[in-house]
Amino acid sequence: MHKNKILVPLSNNSYEVIIKQGLINNIGEELIRIGINSNRKILIVSNKEISTLFGRKLLNNLKKNNFNAEIFNIKAGESHKNFASLSEIFNAAFEVGLDRNSLLIALGGGIVGDVTGFAAATWLRGIEYIQIPTTLLSMVDSSVGGKTAVNHPKGKNLIGAFYQPKAVFIDPETLITLPTREFKAGMAEVIKYGVIKDKSLFEYLENEKNRDKILNLENESLIKIINKSIKTKACIVSEDEKENGIRAILNYGHSFGHVIENLCGYGEYLHGEAISIGMKIAGDIATEKNLWSKEHSLRQDHLIESYGLPIQTPKIKKNDVMKILMGDKKVRNGKMRFILPIELGEVDIFNDINESQFLKYFN
């Protein structure tokens, strides 16, 4: 099977994203190829479910290539993306004796990847880590770009660091075991790339035959949307690694989405489901401000719904919405900034949105 290779070009610490069917069986060989010697200790961080599915396979391959590796599982779910899980990883790192020459591997979805990345950024002031994402959302979004974090009771991803992985290894075969709801949630991030930067991807996703292939996990279609999504993200991240400018457009739908995740209770809505509703709200505001046409807004809404994702805003107290938004990482000098579409495949950053223009979408 052909191996897709995407470079994330940065001023320091550029790295590869490798996409290949069956790659989970060859991670040891890939580590050696990128210069990681087998004398380095490895701690694989996963959760019980993912570890049961893929952990033993990965561990056996690493040991076949003479790596000294062990697996440690954290609890699954957004509610465990916290300091407790981070501390558990630190305890495991201490027990197995990870030093500055050691390696962490994140095997799992976005939560495992974010927490493991933050552990790598802070253990002994920084050790290398590898991302092996096993969900669509983590493949196309969170595993690439170096954002690592844990949640705080006051908000999502408030404590973290920009810390790039040594490499990202993606095996689309791992999606076969992914629950349908989680796969569809991952499609929200793919749709996002179509709206913010890649009109051709948006149109590809609109095609009914393509949609059926994607939802039926047809390999060629999966690799195509993963490839296009990561290329878009790599292009943006290479231009603005630490989100001082254009990288903020990757947060399209996320300000409102994070409000929904937080106020409805983490886990009530999956991240991608909340982002879908956030994109719907952003699209409606853009239409109201004559930034893009009603037709484009309706096309976006239809595309979101066609992949089984929600667009209906849940009932939330308006006062609570403002508290969460003012704690958003995109706030600058006390002003909220919103990513709004101005065309299919193009968005911009606005800080002149009145409260009344978005609070009305929350009951």
Swiss-Prot record:
Q: How is the cofactor bound?
A: Binds 1 divalent metal cation per subunit. Can use either Co(2+) or Zn(2+).
Q: Where in the cell is it found?
A: Cytoplasm
Q: Which reaction does it catalyse?
A: 7-phospho-2-dehydro-3-deoxy-D-arabino-heptonate = 3-dehydroquinate + phosphate
* Single Gene Ontology BP annotation: aromatic amino acid family biosynthetic process
Under the heading Pfam families, the entry gives:
DHQ_synthase, DHQS_C
Report residues binding Zn(2+).
189, 254, 271
Give the source's domain of life in one word: Bacteria
| Broad class of where this protein is predominantly found | cytoplasm
Cofactor or coenzyme needed: NAD(+); Co(2+); Zn(2+)
Q: Give the pathway listed in the UniProt entry for this protein.
A: Metabolic intermediate biosynthesis; chorismate biosynthesis; chorismate from D-erythrose 4-phosphate and phosphoenolpyruvate: step 2/7
- Residues recorded as binding NAD(+), renumbered to this chain, are 134-135, 147, 156, 174-177
Alphabetized Gene3D superfamilies for the sequence: 3.40.50.1970, Dehydroquinate synthase-like - alpha domain
Alphabetized, the UniProt keywords read:
Amino-acid biosynthesis, Aromatic amino acid biosynthesis, Cobalt, Cytoplasm, Lyase, Metal-binding, NAD, Nucleotide-binding, Zinc
The EC number(s) attached to this protein equal 4.2.3.4
Which Cys residues form disulphide pairs? none
Q: What does this protein do?
A: Catalyzes the conversion of 3-deoxy-D-arabino-heptulosonate 7-phosphate (DAHP) to dehydroquinate (DHQ).
Q: Which HAMAP family match?
A: DHQ_synthase
Instruction: State the NCBIfam families in the record.
Output: aroB
Q: Which family does it belong to?
A: Belongs to the sugar phosphate cyclases superfamily. Dehydroquinate synthase family.
Protein's UniProt name: 3-dehydroquinate synthase
Species whose genome carries this gene: Prochlorococcus marinus subsp. pastoris (strain CCMP1986 / NIES-2087 / MED4)
